[in-house]
């Protein structure tokens, strides 16, 4: 096994592990906000790691530059966290409750200020 194959294998294993952690978080976390956090953080980094391994494989082993993979990595990196944030805000706005043991609600203050300012 060459050094390139070891590096690529490490990226694939890291990506698989992070995706597994995201899947476990989606199942185990008690509310929609925790589940969104698990899905957007660890699963996104897992997908990016696997795509980076794919890019390195084609570039270093086969000598082919696959720009579409780099664009896909950039697209996932930029859009997945924003989509998770928007889904969380939407859930909050329609009244999906926080977990009863949650200790902090940062959006409550912001929405109270907006409601006072609109009157």
Curated annotation (Swiss-Prot):
Keyword Repeat tagged: no
Q: Which Pfam families match?
A: PhaG_MnhG_YufB
Q: Where does it live in the cell?
A: Cell membrane
Keywords per UniProt: Antiport, Cell membrane, Hydrogen ion transport, Ion transport, Membrane, Sodium, Sodium transport, Transmembrane, Transmembrane helix, Transport
GO cellular component terms listed in the entry, alphabetical order: plasma membrane
The record's principal subcellular location, in a coarse class, is membrane
**InterPro entries found in the cross-reference section:** PhaG_MnhG_YufB (IPR005133)
Q: How does the protein associate with the membrane?
A: Multi-pass membrane protein
Q: Where are the transmembrane segments?
A: 7-29, 44-61, 66-88
Q: Name one GO molecular function term.
A: sodium:proton antiporter activity
Cite any additional comment in the entry.
Mrp-dependent antiport apparently occurs by a secondary, proton motive force-dependent mechanism, but the similarity of several Mrp proteins to membrane-embedded subunits of energy-coupled NADH dehydrogenase complexes raises the possibility that there is a capacity for electron transport that could provide a primary energy coupling option for Mrp functions.
The record's similarity note reads: Belongs to the CPA3 antiporters (TC 2.A.63) subunit G family.
What is this protein's function?
Mnh complex is a Na(+)Li(+)/H(+) antiporter involved in Na(+) and/or Li(+) excretion and Na(+) resistance. Na(+)/H(+) antiport consumes a transmembrane electrical potential, and is thus inferred to be electrogenic. Does not transport K(+), Ca(2+) or Mg(2+).
Subunit structure comment from the entry: Forms a heterooligomeric complex that consists of seven subunits: MrpA, MrpB, MrpC, MrpD, MrpE, MrpF and MrpG.
Query: Know the name of this protein?
Result: Na(+)/H(+) antiporter subunit G
What does the record give as the organism's lineage? Bacteria, Bacillati, Bacillota, Bacilli, Bacillales
Q: Which gene encodes it?
A: mrpG
